[in-house]
Swiss-Prot record:
GO cellular component terms given for this protein: cytosol
Top-rank taxon, per record: Bacteria
EC number(s) recorded for this UniProt protein: 4.2.3.5
Name the UniProt record assigns to this protein: Chorismate synthase
Gene, per the UniProt record: aroC
Annotated residues for binding of NADP(+): 48, 54
Region of interest called Disordered, as start-end residue ranges on this chain: 41-60
Pathway involvement of the protein, from the record: Metabolic intermediate biosynthesis; chorismate biosynthesis; chorismate from D-erythrose 4-phosphate and phosphoenolpyruvate: step 7/7
Length: 364
């Protein structure tokens, strides 16, 4: 099975399954000398881990990460960093009834057809449990980006079902279980989720992620444009069905006179492009959004078929998130961090000595 790595200079490779012994990853290309401990990664892992609120799956995993290699006396050595998280709360018996049954909307059917067999326990490799290692690797990238280059990355839930944030207060994001920036909507979100759980159904969500302090010049046209690699990384998150950079699909109804980001010696007057022009970072905040589908692991009966081609009814019995978007915020942050880290190292390798006499613009 290929496709388990991302990046060229900062390379992250993950391994492991939802109900396997452990999850792990290898990070290649991290510069030496970065102070790094398990605690640096644990904060983001705790933000992502299951069982932390009544709105997420009841599966309880501590997600305690261990550093196996690449760190000596508290600093990265420049060699491969090995990370491991053991699975401790598997209940594989919850899935015995779907051993030969395809869950609609899941990867069961496609994995079976591609590989000729599948790990039916919680979806195996296709489970979002795998993203724990992306979050761990992303935390390493986030620390380097912030400590060495002053780059900050912040994600938040901008919409859950029909409820959208009308204000953006970053101080509220970590104060509630939804990572929601609009405190006035928290009561409505709570009520909506309560009713959703009663019905046994699920709902989709929109997650936004912003990177500030990104220097001008990251991105490698034409096939490794920064926005293309960001879209690739974000689209690779489980349940993501859409990615927007900047105004995204909103540009369809914009006129050129509205959508262009006007410039002056004082800076850019807007950021419709989301901080990327021609596939290269402009120095403005990088803004991306992802749409996550509602999980089809629900207790509402649905029609499907068995591996033998017979009709069957599916009712999910395992422990699942009624809205997978709630735990997706640190995952989106991690994937953006991994891409920015990779492109920063690539830019440094080729363009470190480039000197442009054009003034660097900020936001007005």
């Amino acid at each position: 099975m290929s496709g388990n790595s991302i990046g060229q200079n900062f390379v992250v490779t993950t391994f492991g399954e939802s109900h396997g012994v452990a999850l792990g990853c290898i990070i290649d290309g991290c510069p030496p000398g970065l102070e790094l401990t398990e605690a640096d990664m644990q904060h983001d892992l705790d933000r992502r881990r299951p069982g932390t609120s009544r709105y997420t799956t009841a599966r309880r995993e501590p997600d305690e990460v261990r550093i196996l290699s690449g760190v000596f006396e508290g600093k990265t050595t420049g060699t491969s960093i090995g990370l491991l998280i053991e699975n401790t709360d598997q209940r594989s018996q919850d899935y015995s009834n779907i051993k030969d049954l395809f869950r609609p909307g899941h990867a069961d059917y496609t994995y079976q057809q591609k590989y000729g067999l599948r790990d039916y326990r919680g979806g195996g490799r296709s489970s979002a449990r795998e993203t724990a290692m992306r979050v761990a690797a992303g935390a390493v990238a986030k620390k380097y980006l912030k400590q060495v280059h002053g780059i900050n990355i912040q994600g938040y839930m901008s919409q859950l079902g029909p409820i959208s944030a009308e204000t953006l207060d970053f101080s509220q994001i970590e104060q509630n279980a939804f990572f929601f920036p609009d405190a006035s909507k928290l009561e409505a979100l709570d009520e909506y989720m309560r009713e959703l759980k009663k019905s046994g159904d699920s709902i989709g969500a929109k997650i936004s992620v912003v990177a500030t302090g990104v220097p001008v010049g990251l991105g490698e046209p034409v096939f490794d444009r920064l926005d293309a690699d960001i879209a690739h990384a974000l689209m690779g998150i489980n349940a993501v069905k859409g990615v927007e950079i900047g105004d995204g699909f909103g540009v369809v109804t914009q006129k050129g006179s509205e959508g262009r980001d006007l410039m002056s010696p004082l800076g850019f007057e807007s950021n419709h492009a989301g901080g990327i022009l021609g596939g290269i970072s402009s120095g403005q905040p990088i803004v991306a959004h992802i749409a996550l589908k509602p999980t089809s692991s629900i207790s509402v009966p649905g029609q499907s078929m068995t591996a033998q081609g017979e009709m069957a009814e599916v009712v999910t019995k395992g422990r699942h998130d009624p809205c997978v978007g709630i735990r997706a915020v640190p995952i989106a942050e991690a994937m953006l961090a991994i891409v920015l880290m990779d492109h920063l190292l690539r830019h440094r390798a080729q363009n470190q000595d480039v000197c442009s006499h054009t003034p660097i613009l900020g936001m007005r």
